[in-house]
Amino acid sequence: MPGGPGAPSSPAASSGSSRAAPSGIAACPLSPPPLARGSPQASGPRRGASVPQKLAETLSSQYGLNVFVAGLLFLLAWAVHATGVGKSDLLCVLTALMLLQLLWMLWYVGRSYMQRRLIRPKDTHAGARWLRGSITLFAFITVVLGCLKVAYFIGFSECLSATEGVFPVTHAVHTLLQVYFLWGHAKDIIMSFKTLERFGVIHSVFTNLLLWANSVLNESKHQLNEHKERLITLGFGNITIVLDDHTPQCNCTPPALCSALSHGIYYLYPFNIEYQILASTMLYVLWKNIGRRVDSSQHQKMQCRFDGVLVGSVLGLTVLAATIAVVVVYMIHIGRSKSKSESALIMFYLYAITVLLLMGAAGLVGSWIYRVDEKSLDESKNPARKLDVDLLVATGSGSWLLSWGSILAIACAETRPPYTWYNLPYSVLVIVEKYVQNIFIIESVHLEPEGVPEDVRTLRVVTVCSSEAAALAASTLGSQGMAQDGSPAVNGNLCLQQRCGKEDQESGWEGATGTTRCLDFLQGGMKRRLLRNITAFLFLCNISLWIPPAFGCRPEYDNGLEEIVFGFEPWIIVVNLAMPFSIFYRMHAAAALFEVYCKI
């Protein structure tokens, strides 16, 4: 039975401590104390309970996949104008899925409120505050989008189905309750009603994915119609232009307001798309955490400090301002005439090449710092971190598919417009930059977080090699009985003193040389500032590169070269499949970089 604070240690422990630590200095705790019998962390998973829980996980995942596949087929049937499948049928299916999720969330929130006095395990890595803040912002814009859709429905109420008015209202209610649910329960580790909860959570995951796919399809149809209208301007008259227009066949009152609402809806779709995919990822982590046994170590809260990142922030904000200017000029010039369209494409490629070169260089410097620093890796099981890494690689493949398609089209084309030679380095850099950035982010999220703030760590450097200060700290700990619960800075002080002293004795160095080795911590502040600037710069650059494709600046559509080589329909299918993943990659990379910044 472990002793309480201040209890004397056993003789064996005392002898081991005296051998490991210099005289007069208390030994560092080598391991956390044993857990009390009966605690959730102490009891390992029961052998008999693993089979039904694994079966429930398999059954729920298959249920979710069937819901998703069936929903995708409804979306496809509506997109290709299949007989007997109209927009009202699709909206009825999505509304029913949302209502079912609403019932489950209300039941879960009500049951949690009834059991609010119970202590429940939490996954401290899941549902970070900044992530919940981001999803709240996107949810607010999604609710505004729903209001615009309701106003659009009122304007065309004479010829629109009632489901087109019910759907945005249901979606707005679903969004508000889901954000409340994620704020309060994203960190939960569900240990009761696990089979039922698995089906409820996985239903929520794939409902959000279907809503995401619906938004992507609507936004892609709008972008494709605009692209078809611009192709004739670029001189590609051999491509048949057939607009896939779903405009209601009646007059709107007033017409100017309805036109403004229609344009406003499509400008808000990118934020709605990000909201749905973020919600599905947070719910997926909740699903993976059902029945999970957490370890006893408490996760240290990350505190983001925004001092010392002036250079990275200024460079990143400069890129952001340049991005907005490029997008505005691009949207004004593209499609006006062939010469203006070509100049807009060249301008975009030059801008993107410059930004990608800077981002690749920053990522290489950051990875080199990690190679020199040789910090230990965090090998603990973390569903949220694993999902982040998997999403980075999976969504990055969307851009790689488009880039390799452009490279192959340039190599096989019979005639090459002037902007072709800017498209080639741009496509190569997209591949290389994502490769480098993924390595930097993945290595960063697997590093152990800094245990002590920078100012405390610097203070520890100054006092660590003073034997009087170490002895005073040891006596203070002994008198207060806080060998385990003491201040992290003091505990780290003693640990560092012990380690430095032991290394000096083994190497035969004198005290002055040992002091020099201990002062190596001073270099850590410079490394951290450099890494913070790199991360801040990459964060703002990823936000910048998210803006052009999200708001219609898509050279993969507008240069026309790939459509000639691969054919119009095949290339459009490739772009419509890969572009949503490419757009989401930038936002997800920005979120991951923000988390990396807080860890440094």
UniProtKB/Swiss-Prot annotation:
Membrane protein topology class: Multi-pass membrane protein
Q: Which residues form the signal peptide?
A: none
Which parts of the chain does the record assign to the membrane side Extracellular?
79-86, 152-161, 218-262, 333-342, 412-421, 552-569
Q: Does the keyword Hydrolase apply?
A: no
Q: What are the record's GO terms for cellular component?
A: membrane; microvillus; plasma membrane
Q: What effect on the protein does mutating E219K have, as reported in its record?
A: Greatly reduced proton channel activity
Give the induction note: Up-regulated in adipocytes in response to TNF, but not IFNG. Up-regulated in epididymal white adipose tissue in animals on high-fat diet.
Output compositional bias ranges, type Low complexity: 7-27
The text the record gives for the protein's domains is: Residues involved in the gating by extracellular Zn (2+) and pH are located in the extracellular loops between transmembrane domain 5-6 and transmembrane domain 11-12.
Extract the PANTHER family matched here. Answer: PROTON CHANNEL OTOP, PROTON CHANNEL OTOP1
Q: How does it assemble?
A: Homodimer. Interacts with STAT1, independently of STAT1 phosphorylation status.
Q: What does this protein do?
A: Proton-selective ion channel. Biphasically modulated by acid and alkali, mediating proton influx and efflux in response to extracellular acid and base stimulation, respectively. Sour taste receptor, which carries inward currents in response to extracellular acidification. Sensor for ammonium chloride (NH(4)Cl) in taste receptor cells. NH(4)Cl acts by increasing the intracellular pH, thereby generating a driving force for proton entry through OTOP1 channel. Might also participate in alkaline sensation.
The name of this protein is: Proton channel OTOP1
